Amino acid sequence: GCPWMPWC
């Protein structure tokens, strides 16, 4: 996941 988007 991305640091700012947990669903990435």
Swiss-Prot record:
GO terms for molecular function: ion channel regulator activity; toxin activity. One of its GO terms (cellular component) is extracellular region. Signal peptide: none annotated. Its target is unknown, but this toxin may modulate voltage-activated calcium channels (Cav) or calcium-dependent potassium channels (KCa). Its main location: secreted. The modification 4-hydroxyproline is found at residue 3. Belongs to the O2 superfamily. Contryphan family. Expressed by the venom duct. InterPro entries: Contryphan_CS. Keywords: Amidation, Disulfide bond, Hydroxylation, Ion channel impairing toxin, Neurotoxin, Secreted, Toxin. The keyword Disulfide bond applies. The cysteine framework is C-C. It is found in: Secreted. This is Contryphan-Fib. It comes from the Eukaryota. The modification Cysteine amide is found at residue 8. It comes from Conus figulinus. Disulfide bonds join 2-8. Exists in two forms, due to cis-trans isomerization at 2-Cys-hydroxyPro-3. The cis conformation is the major form.
